[in-house]
């Protein structure tokens, strides 16, 4: 899970308060999450929302804008008024947009400006407790026995989880089927429900 400390939250509220010189306290502040509710990025945004409302005395909303591996939400923020009232809460997804989209809706290097690092998180591979896999070696063995039969969920094509699993499968010489989702919440639900074997994410 993401590592968040009280000091981090205090610094974040200070950064949001002073970074945008044109911020208008009377207006609603919006934190755009480029994934559906229920995932780790959404959970982090809601922690940040509560803290910012308390510290800044402003109304702060979380808006989930999922799709296209996070690029739709990123594009919405890029096109918003530069008044310091709209922010993107994301992880690595925006960085791969130029590589996975032929005609991206934004230039991530020019249209977005980093404000603050709120947290960090490890990437893990997890499975339903009822599945026979106890180690990644078990996953590799099952994939070798029946190529393509093992499925893993990620939060979208081209995201870090997808790329990492693709590299791991290539190094192991196996075929593992990728099942992309719009976000970590729906992906985790299907893994817990036994519809997909594995999930890779934070």
PLM regions: where:
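N-terminal signal peptide c-region/cleavage motif recognized by signal peptidases
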Residues: 18-20
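Hydrophobic residues within well-ordered alpha-helices
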Residues: 38, 77-78, 165, 191-192
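Short, polar/charged alpha-helical segment
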Residues: 38-57, 162-170
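Extracytoplasmic "Venus flytrap"
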Residues: 31-44, 68, 154-160
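N-terminal export leaders
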Residues: 5-10
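Short, well-ordered beta-strand elements
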Residues: 27-36, 61, 86, 149-153
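Paired acidic/hydrophobic, glycine-rich loop segments that form the ligand-binding mouth/hinge
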Residues: 84-90, 197-201
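Hinge/capping helix and adjacent helix->loop/strand transition within the periplasmic-binding protein
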Residues: 79-85, 99-186
């Amino acid at each position: 899970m993401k590592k968040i400390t009280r000091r981090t939250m205090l610094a974040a509220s200070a950064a949001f308060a002073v970074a945008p010189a044109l911020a208008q306290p009377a207006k609603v502040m919006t934190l755009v999450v480029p994934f559906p509710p229920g995932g780790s990025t959404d959970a982090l945004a809601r922690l940040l929302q509560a803290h910012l409302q308390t510290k800044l005395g402003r109304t702060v909303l979380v808006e989930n804008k999922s799709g296209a591996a996070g690029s739709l939400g990123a594009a919405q923020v890029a096109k918003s008024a530069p008044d310091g009232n709209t922010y993107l809460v994301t992880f690595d997804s925006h960085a791969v947009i130029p590589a996975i989209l032929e005609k991206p809706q934004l230039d991530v290097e020019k249209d977005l400006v980093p404000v603050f690092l709120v947290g960090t998180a490890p990437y893990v591979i997890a499975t339903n407790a009822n599945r026979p896999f106890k180690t990644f070696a078990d996953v590799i063995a099952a994939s070798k026995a029946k190529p393509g039969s093992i499925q893993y969920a990620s939060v979208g094509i081209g995201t870090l989880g997808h790329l990492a699993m693709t590299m791991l499968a290539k190094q192991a010489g196996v075929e593992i089927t990728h099942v992309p989702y719009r976000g970590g919440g729906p992906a985790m639900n299907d893994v817990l429900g036994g519809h997909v074997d594995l999930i890779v994410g934070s």
